[in-house]
Structure formats: C-alpha cells, structure tokens
C-alpha cells in the first residue's frame, strides 16, 4: 500500500470516538483562536472588498455565514471571506514543520460546509481533525523546499480543506 493510500484509509476510517480527548480539546482551542483571528480583521480595508465580491458574485443569502458581518451567503463565498478574514492579521495558527496555517483553510471550509449540511459540532470537530491531519502530513512530506516557491497554505491547504469537507460528506478512501 502506498503512503497516499495509507493516509486516505486512515482519514476515511477516522471516527470521533477514536480521537483522543486532548486532541479534541486542542481542536476546540484552535477553532476559537481562528474565530478570534477572523474577528480581529474587522474594519481592515481588504475584508469589505472580499465581502462585496461575495455579495456581487454569490447569492443574496445562503446556508453559511460570514463571521465578521454575520451575513449569510453560499458555503463557497463564506469560506472565501472567512478564510481571508482569519489570515489577514497573521495571528492564525502555524504548524512549523509543515509550514502551514491549517486553521485558515480547514476551519473556513469545514464550518461553511457544516452549516450547509446541518452537521453537528462533533461532525465539525471530526472533519477539522481530518483536515489538519491531511494538511500537516502532506505539508511535512512536501518539506520546506516547497515553501521556497509556493505558499504551502495555498497549495497543501487546498487538500486539507478538501479532506475536511469530504469527511463531512462521508467520502470513502477512494473519493
């Protein structure tokens, strides 16, 4: 079995009940920190630009919320604005060896999808842990040399967000 298949199997089989209590508590702390980072961007010039873009390009309302304004929009645009908001003030978490800011990409996507799919807090935590696991492991595999050319949060973070949302959607290891 390849490393990719092993990781996909691990993530697909991951269940809330098997996550250590300390990991769940840390994930809750990271989630609150992420919300604080997003709210800290309130009033910063770029955020209204992202919100106006979401307003013009997206639906008038939707199933997911923008943290800073409380406005509802599509999950796609809520994740976009919340991700930008939470990364703007550079207070979001950093995992050093993967050179990744996982909260920005994982929580933004997972919260928007969880709202859209009417998922529970447990589901949100499980999906977030899966997204963090994927992002950190892939980021560590890519190594620091990847960061010399690419912004790991943008490249590896895309995969981390996809894994988190896939977990909410019930994807199996092949998906």
Language model: regions and residue ranges:
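N-terminal core-entry segment
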Residues: 1-175
């Amino acid at each position: 079995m390849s490393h990719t298949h092993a990781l996909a199997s691990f993530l697909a089989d991951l269940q809330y009940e098997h996550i250590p209590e300390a990991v769940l508590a840390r994930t809750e702390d990271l989630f609150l920190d992420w919300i604080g980072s997003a709210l800290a961007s309130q009033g910063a010039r770029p955020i209204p630009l992202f919100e106006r873009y979401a307003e013009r390009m997206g639906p008038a309302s939707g199933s997911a919320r923008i943290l800073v304004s409380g406005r509802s929009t599509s999950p796609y645009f809520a994740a976009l604005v919340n991700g930008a908001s939470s990364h703007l003030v550079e207070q979001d978490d950093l995992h050093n060896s993967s050179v990744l800011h996982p909260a920005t990409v994982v929580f933004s996507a997972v919260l928007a999808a969880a709202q859209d799919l009417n998922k529970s807090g447990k589901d949100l935590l499980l999906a977030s842990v899966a997204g963090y696991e994927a992002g950190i492991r892939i980021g560590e595999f890519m190594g620091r040399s990847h960061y010399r050319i690419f912004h790991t949060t943008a490249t590896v973070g895309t995969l981390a967000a996809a894994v988190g949302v896939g977990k909410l959607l019930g994807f199996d290891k092949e998906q």
